């Protein structure tokens, strides 16, 4: 399969990342999924998903619309709890602890596992207050602590130099790409362990998309990142590992280079080469 899939021009080195040899089996595990099923009412949406998400790596979920990739992503911080009729069977373990166990503090889980959505969603507040929002909820109000957190998070989101002189202006005045980086700053300000990105570039122009992709590459030194994307070129550029999903099932999961150039499953090859999807 190698020649055919490689001929589709997937560019693995657009970000200049280190193409080191990766071995999923030897990675430290951040999120463990030993068997997960999910139902919306009587309809099953995820079927016995089993995977380990490696620590401080970028894992991409790809697959056609409706394949379950965003549904699975939202399981990792229990956002599906907010969907009427949604029911989960099985476990997801964060640092060895089942996030669906009784007594789990869901608010604390969502601090540890932050999420950025498709459309930038800054609050109608100042740039500064957007970044410190989660910290204030935690009862942190000392100005020095907040000031340091704002600078750290905005630098981490590659936005500090663009906004440092207008921190108290409305976040709604930022461009779409800047707003998305602000949302990332707001998410990392509470120092999560995992960042979930649900098609974070789908509403952005190519220049803003490149900035987000470069940011993802920088952030993985501090955070475990899981990204859902419809853009296979993007998955190839930013991720270390890629999972291909189809009709609620995990078809193939492995290092990105191998999955795109020499997939093990015919379904994966068909999707990558554009035969369906």
Swiss-Prot record:
It is a peripheral membrane protein. It is found in: Cell inner membrane. It catalyses: phosphate(out) + ATP + H2O = ADP + 2 phosphate(in) + H(+). Keywords: ATP-binding, Cell inner membrane, Cell membrane, Membrane, Nucleotide-binding, Phosphate transport, Translocase, Transport. The keyword Nucleotide-binding applies. Residues 31-272 form the ABC transporter domain. SMART domains: AAA. GO terms for molecular function: ATP binding; ATP hydrolysis activity; ATPase-coupled phosphate ion transmembrane transporter activity. The keyword Transit peptide does not apply. Belongs to the ABC transporter superfamily. Phosphate importer (TC 3.A.1.7) family. InterPro entries: AAA+_ATPase, ABC_transporter-like_ATP-bd, ABC_transporter-like_CS, P-loop_NTPase, PstB-like. This is Phosphate import ATP-binding protein PstB. The gene is pstB. It comes from the Bacteria. Its EC number is 7.3.2.1. GO terms for biological process: phosphate ion transmembrane transport. ATP binds at residues 63-70. GO terms for cellular component: plasma membrane. The complex is composed of two ATP-binding proteins (PstB), two transmembrane proteins (PstC and PstA) (Potential). PstS is missing in this species. PANTHER family: ABC TRANSPORTER I FAMILY MEMBER 17 (PTHR43423), IRON EXPORT ATP-BINDING PROTEIN FETA-RELATED (PTHR43423:SF12).
């Amino acid at each position: 399969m190698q020649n055919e899939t490689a001929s589709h021009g997937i560019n693995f080195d657009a970000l200049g990342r280190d193409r080191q040899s990766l071995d999923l089996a030897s990675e430290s595990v951040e999120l463990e999924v030993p068997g997960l099923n999910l139902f919306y009412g009587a309809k099953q949406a995820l079927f016995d998903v089993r995977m380990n998400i490696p620590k401080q790596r970028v894992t991409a979920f790809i697959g056609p619309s409706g394949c379950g990739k965003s549904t699975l992503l939202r399981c990792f911080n229990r956002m599906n709890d907010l969907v009427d009729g949604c029911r989960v069977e099985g476990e997801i373990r964060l640092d060895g602890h089942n996030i669906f166990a009784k007594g789990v503090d869901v608010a604390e889980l969502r601090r540890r596992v932050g999420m950025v959505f498709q459309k930038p969603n800054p609050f109608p507040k100042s740039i500064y207050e957007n970044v410190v929002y989660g910290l204030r909820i935690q009862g942190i109000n000392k100005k020095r602590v907040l000031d340091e957190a704002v600078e750290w998070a905005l630098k981490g989101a590659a936005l500090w130099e663009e906004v440092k002189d207008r921190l108290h202006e409305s976040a709604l005045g930022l461009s779409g790409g800047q707003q998305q980086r602000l949302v990332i700053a707001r998410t990392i300000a509470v120092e999560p362990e995992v960042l979930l990105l649900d098609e974070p570039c789908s509403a952005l122009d190519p220049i803003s998309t490149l900035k987000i992709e470069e940011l993802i590459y920088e952030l993985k030194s501090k955070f475990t990142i899981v990204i859902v994307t419809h853009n296979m070129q993007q998955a190839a550029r930013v991720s270390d590992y890629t999972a291909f999903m189809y009709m609620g099932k995990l078809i193939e999961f492995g290092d990105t280079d191998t999955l795109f150039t020499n997939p093990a499953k015919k379904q994966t090859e068909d999707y990558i080469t554009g035969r369906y999807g």
